[in-house]
């Protein structure tokens, strides 16, 4: 199949005003997408965005392009990425468009598409859109132009959808929860969801100004929520990223619960209820501790390449339901078509209530192994992944680690860097082994 030139594995993304992220290209992209999508039955598209100041710019450009191609546009304003996927289905739109750069700083932005069923757009459709980009922009006749409307009740619809994943017979009454919205798209959603389910909510990262998304808050910057959980004597914390598709949690002692441990909680809960279908999909970066803990429960575990798109591919291939990344992308296909941080948090809270257990108790039997990642630059045409010196160092370390350790070597896709990841039982040894392999890479001539 022809390779995509414009779309990456998760749409397009970059610095605003440079490369692909310009208003000119957004206008043309809206038109090209409209041309392709108009070949199907439903002539309407939903657009949502996060809280970056540039969201207004790209929203206007996309809606103009789509209208010029004859498609109606429904604007839902700042909304989490999974909300766009859900609302695309419920409004029976032909596609959903998200304007977001997820966990990146405010000066980046991105554009990605959902199909009418709320899943990522097929590669074939993205290739069709790319083909239209090469053509001159032409406008449909005036009477065929698309209409643009704003949907005022989108937030309320999504709040009710999220609450629907929590058992009706349960309540969060008595729980004090810190919710970090990363000054992002969940700022007006997540606190309301958990409050309406009965919890006492302390919200942080809930005052976006267009420039502070993901700035020292959210799932990629856990310091503030850990401090707040301890200072407020809260039962737990839930941290989301800028577009709401990732989650990290914090227990009452201020310890971070990452995506691997969340996957473990959900898999164990599903197994106990007799609803676990198959096993769990992680990634190459998933901690070996998750693998070993699931083995102890006879739950199959497989690894995909890094990226929620690849996790989804393996889930579909195996016909399994639960998968995700240690970074907090959690997929549960019984509860949605894409990663949803709020829903994943609700499912963990439901497991706590069902089992009358704390986060500490639910994670007591999974021991995360020390993991060290070293980025090392290599020069010239030497490929460290085929170097006998590097491979010998890797084999030596693997022999020393045995079954209780793992070595992963990955090249960066954008610069001459090798990522050396080593995990095992002892922090000191793991650190030494990672630098031993990194030195072998540096010694390549």
Swiss-Prot record:
Name of the protein this chain belongs to: Phosphoglucosamine mutase
Cofactor needs: Mg(2+)
Highest taxon above the source species: Bacteria
Magnesium keyword on record: yes
UniProt keyword terms in alphabetical order: Isomerase, Magnesium, Metal-binding, Phosphoprotein
Gene3D superfamilies to which the protein is assigned, alphabetical: Alpha-D-Glucose-1,6-Bisphosphate, subunit A, domain 3 (3.40.120.10), Alpha-D-phosphohexomutase, C-terminal domain (3.30.310.50)
Active site (catalytic residues): 102
Keyword Isomerase: yes
Gene Ontology MF terms in the entry: magnesium ion binding; phosphoglucosamine mutase activity; phosphomannomutase activity
Function in brief: Catalyzes the conversion of glucosamine-6-phosphate to glucosamine-1-phosphate.
Amino acids binding Mg(2+): 102, 241, 243, 245
GO terms, biological process: carbohydrate metabolic process; peptidoglycan biosynthetic process; UDP-N-acetylglucosamine biosynthetic process
The protein's enzyme class: isomerase
InterPro entries in the record: A-D-PHexomutase_a/b/a-I (IPR005844), A-D-PHexomutase_a/b/a-I/II/III (IPR016055), A-D-PHexomutase_a/b/a-II (IPR005845), A-D-PHexomutase_a/b/a-III (IPR005846), A-D-PHexomutase_C (IPR005843), A-D-PHexomutase_C_sf (IPR036900), A-D-PHexomutase_CS (IPR016066), Alpha-D-phosphohexomutase_SF (IPR005841)
PROSITE patterns: PGM_PMM
The organism of origin for this protein: Shewanella halifaxensis (strain HAW-EB4)
Protein's gene: glmM
Family: Belongs to the phosphohexose mutase family.
Enzyme Commission number, as recorded: 5.4.2.10
A GO cellular component annotation in the UniProt record: cytosol
Post-translational modification comment from the UniProt entry: Activated by phosphorylation.
Residue list for modification Phosphoserine: 102
Cofactor binding, note field: Binds 1 Mg(2+) ion per subunit.
Catalytic activity: alpha-D-glucosamine 1-phosphate = D-glucosamine 6-phosphate
Pfam families: PGM_PMM_I, PGM_PMM_II, PGM_PMM_III, PGM_PMM_IV
Upper lineage: Bacteria, Pseudomonadati, Pseudomonadota, Gammaproteobacteria, Alteromonadales
CDD domains to which the protein is assigned, alphabetical: GlmM
């Amino acid at each position: 199949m022809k390779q995509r030139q414009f779309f990456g594995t998760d749409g397009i993304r970059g610095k605003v005003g440079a490369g692909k992220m310009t208003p000119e290209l957004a206008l043309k992209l809206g038109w090209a997408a409209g041309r392709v999508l108009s070949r199907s039955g439903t002539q309407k598209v939903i657009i949502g965005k996060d809280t970056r100041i540039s969201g207004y710019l790209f929203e206007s450009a996309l809606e103009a392009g789509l209208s010029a191609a004859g498609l109606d546009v429904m604007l839902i304003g700042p909304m989490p990425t999974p909300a766009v996927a859900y609302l695309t289905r419920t409004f029976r739109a032909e596609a959903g468009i998200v304007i977001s750069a997820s966990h990146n700083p405010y000066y980046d932005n991105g554009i990605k598409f959902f199909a009418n069923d709320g899943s990522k757009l097929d590669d074939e459709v993205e290739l069709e859109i790319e083909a239209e980009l090469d053509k001159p922009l032409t406008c449909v006749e005036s009477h065929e132009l698309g209409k643009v409307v704003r949907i005022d009740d989108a937030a309320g619809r999504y709040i009710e959808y999220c609450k629907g994943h929590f058992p009706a017979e349960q309540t969060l009454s008595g729980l004090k929860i810190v919710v970090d919205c990363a000054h992002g798209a969940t700022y007006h959603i997540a606190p309301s969801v958990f409050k309406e389910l009965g919890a006492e909510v302390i919200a942080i990262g809930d005052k976006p100004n267009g420039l502070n998304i993901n700035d020292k808050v959210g799932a990629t910057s856990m310091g503030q929520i850990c401090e707040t959980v301890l200072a407020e004597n809260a039962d737990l914390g839930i941290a989301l990223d800028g577009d709401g598709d990732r989650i990290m949690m914090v227990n009452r002692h201020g310890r971070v619960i990452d995506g691997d441990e969340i996957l473990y909680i959900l898999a164990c809960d599903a197994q106990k209820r007799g609803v676990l279908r198959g096993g769990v999909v992680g990634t190459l970066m998933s901690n070996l501790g998750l693998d070993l803990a699931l083995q102890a429960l006879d739950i199959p575990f497989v690894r995909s390449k890094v990226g929620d798109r690849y996790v989804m591919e393996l889930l579909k291939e195996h016909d399994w339901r639960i998968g995700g990344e240690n970074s907090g992308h959690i997929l549960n296909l019984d509860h949605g078509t894409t990663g949803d941080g709020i829903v994943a948090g609700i499912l963990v809270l439901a497991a706590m209530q069902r089992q009358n257990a704390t986060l500490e108790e639910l994670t007591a039997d999974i021991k995360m192994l020390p993991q060290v990642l070293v980025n090392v630059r290599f020069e010239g045409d030497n490929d460290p992944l085929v170097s006998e010196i590097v491979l010998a160092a890797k084999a030596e370390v693997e022999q020393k680690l045995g079954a209780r350790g793992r070595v992963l070597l990955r090249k960066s896709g954008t610069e001459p860097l090798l990522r050396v990841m080593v995990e095992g039982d002892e922090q000191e040894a793991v650190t030494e082994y990672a630098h031993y392999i990194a030195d072998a890479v540096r010694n390549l001539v």
